[in-house]
Swiss-Prot record:
This is Putative carbonic anhydrase 1. It comes from Lottia gigantea (Giant owl limpet). It catalyses: hydrogencarbonate + H(+) = CO2 + H2O. GO terms for molecular function: carbonate dehydratase activity; zinc ion binding. Its EC number is 4.2.1.1. Its cofactor is Zn(2+). Belongs to the alpha-carbonic anhydrase family. Keywords: Lyase, Metal-binding, Secreted, Signal, Zinc. The lineage of its organism: Eukaryota, Metazoa, Spiralia, Lophotrochozoa, Mollusca. It comes from the Eukaryota. Coiled coil: none annotated. It is found in: Secreted. Residues 42-365 form the Alpha-carbonic anhydrase domain. Zn(2+) binds at H139, H141, H165.
Length: 395
C-alpha cells in the first residue's frame, strides 16, 4: 500500500499514538507511571497471592501501575491491521557490537548492557521530543509446555514458540528506573520466535540461546524471595462453587528492596545492569541480527510486562517471527526462578493478556536493509537519525 496522505496520517496518528510534541502534555491522568527500582518476589502462577493478578498490591503503591484497569497495560493481542504506513528510514543500530553479559534474573534470561561500555543507539526512529533510544537489555519469554500460548503478545490470537524483548532507554533519562516513570521513556522491540518457520536463523539469537545453557542456576539466597514468607493460596473457589480460580491479594505484601532504596543496591535486581543475579556469561552480539529482515512492525503504546508495569513503553512488534533453535523453549523453561525449587517451565513467564482499550495499533514498514550486517552503518545517512513518524507529520 502506498504511503497515506499527510492529512489522513496526521489526523489518525497525531490524535492517537503521539498526541502532541510537548512532553508535559503526555502526562494524562489515565496513565499509570511508576519508577522501576527494587524487585518484588513474584510468581507467574495465576492462583498465587504473588501472581500476576496480585502484582499491583505488592508493596503498594510502588507497584500500583500493575493494576489491570490501566488503559495501556501490556501484553496485548494485536489486532489485524490492514493499512501499512511506509517510511523511508531504515531501522538499525549505530554499532554492530553490543557488549554485555547474560544472567538469570530469576524471572527470565536477560542479556544486559555492560556498565561503562559504549551505548548502542537505535537509528531510524526517535522519540516525539527528539531524543534517541539506546539498548539496555535483551530478554526472553516462554509459556508452559504444551500450552497454546507461548508468547506474551499474540498476533490476532496467534502465538509462536517464544518472544524476545529488546529494551531501550530514552537517552535523556540515562537509566531504566527513571525512564519507566515517563511516557515513552522506554521503547521495546518485540520479536516472535519460532522453532519451525520464520525468517532465517541468525547468529544474534543463536549465540544468546546457546549462552542460556550456562546460566541455568539462580542464587536464591541473594534474590528478592529470600527470607520472605509468602501467604498461602486462598481462592474464591473455596467459597463459591464453580467460581473461577482467583487469589485474594494481600495489600502491602513485604518484598525485597535495594539496600539503599535508590535503585543502586546490592541485591538481585532485573532492572539494574549490575543487578547481581547469580552467574554471568560475558559476551557481545551484533544487535542488527536481532531485528526483522522484513521490517514491518506493529506500533502502539503500552507498558512493561513485569512489575512495576509502568505505561511508559512505545512498542514495536515485528510481524514476522524469527526462526531459532528447537532447543530454545527447553533451555528457558529449565532455568531456576526466584523461588527455591521452581523453574520457569512450571508456570512460564508470560503475563496474562491485557485489554486493548481502543488503543490505536499501526503497521509501519521501514525501508529494507541491504548490507547492514557487513558494516554498512547509518553514521552518514541523514534520514536515518530522524523518526520515521516525522514523515507522517508527527515530529
Amino acid at each position: 500500500m502506498k504511503l497515506q496522505g499527510a492529512g489522513c496520517v496526521v489526523a489518525a496518528v497525531l490524535g492517537a499514538l503521539f498526541i502532541v510534541n510537548v512532553e508535559s502534555h503526555f502526562h494524562k491522568p489515565e496513565l499509570q507511571l511508576c519508577k522501576a527500582f527494587g524487585e518484588p518476589c513474584i510468581s507467574y502462577d495465576v492462583r498465587s497471592t504473588i501472581g500476576p493478578r496480585c502484582w499491583f498490591k505488592l508493596e503498594f503503591p510502588r507497584e500500583k501501575c500493575c493494576n489491570e484497569n490501566g488503559k495501556r497495560q501490556s501484553p496485548i493481542d494485536i489486532p489485524d491491521v490492514k493499512s501499512i504506513y511506509k517510511v523511508p528510514q531504515k531501522l538499525r543500530y549505530s554499532s554492530r557490537k553490543f557488549v554485555g553479559h547474560l544472567e538469570n534474573t530469576g524471572i527470565q534470561p536477560a542479556f544486559k548492557r555492560k556498565v561503562g561500555a559504549d551505548k548502542v543507539y537505535l537509528e531510524g526512529i526517535g522519540s516525539p521530543v527528539g531524543k534517541r533510544y539506546f539498548i539496555e537489555n535483551v530478554h526472553f519469554h516462554v509459556g508452559v509446555r504444551h500450552k497454546e500460548r507461548q508468547t506474551e503478545n499474540t498476533l490476532n490470537g496467534r502465538s509462536f514458540d517464544g518472544e524476545a524483548h529488546i529494551v531501550h532507554i530514552r537517552e535523556d533519562f540515562g537509566d531504566l528506573k527513571e525512564a519507566a516513570n515517563h511516557p515513552q521513556g522506554l521503547l521495546v522491540i518485540s520479536i516472535f520466535l519460532s522453532t519451525s518457520k520464520g525468517e532465517r536463523r541468525r547468529d544474534g539469537f543463536d549465540d544468546l540461546i546457546e549462552m542460556i545453557q550456562d546460566v541455568q542456576e539462580f542464587e536464591e539466597e541473594d534474590g528478592p524471595c529470600a527470607n520472605v514468607k509468602i501467604p498461602d493460596i486462598f481462592k474464591f473457589k473455596q467459597l463459591i462453587p464453580f467460581h473461577p480460580v482467583w487469589p485474594i491479594c494481600k495489600k502491602t505484601f513485604p518484598v525485597a528492596d535495594d539496600s539503599d532504596n535508590s535503585g543502586s543496591g546490592v541485591v538481585c535486581n532485573f532492572y539494574l545492569p549490575n543487578g547481581l543475579c547469580g552467574e554471568k556469561k560475558e559476551s557481545k552480539i551484533n544487535p542488527n541480527e536481532l531485528l526483522a529482515d522484513d521490517p514491518e512492525y506493529y506500533v502502539f503504546n503500552g507498558g512493561l510486562t513485569t512489575p512495576p508495569c509502568s505505561e511508559s513503553v512505545l512498542w514495536l512488534v515485528a510481524k514476522q517471527p524469527r526462526k531459532v533453535s528447537v532447543f530454545y523453549p527447553y533451555v528457558v523453561r529449565n532455568m531456576e526462578t526466584q523461588r527455591e525449587g521452581e523453574i520457569i517451565g512450571d508456570f512460564g513467564n508470560l503475563r496474562p493478556l491485557q485489554d486493548l482499550n481502543d488503543r490505536p495499533v499501526f503497521l509501519v514498514r521501514f525501508r529494507l536493509k541491504r548490507n547492514w550486517e557487513h558494516g554498512d552503518t547509518a553514521a552518514n545517512d541523514n534520514d536515518a537519525m530522524d523518526s520515521p513518524f516525522s514523515v507522517l507529520g508527527i515530529n
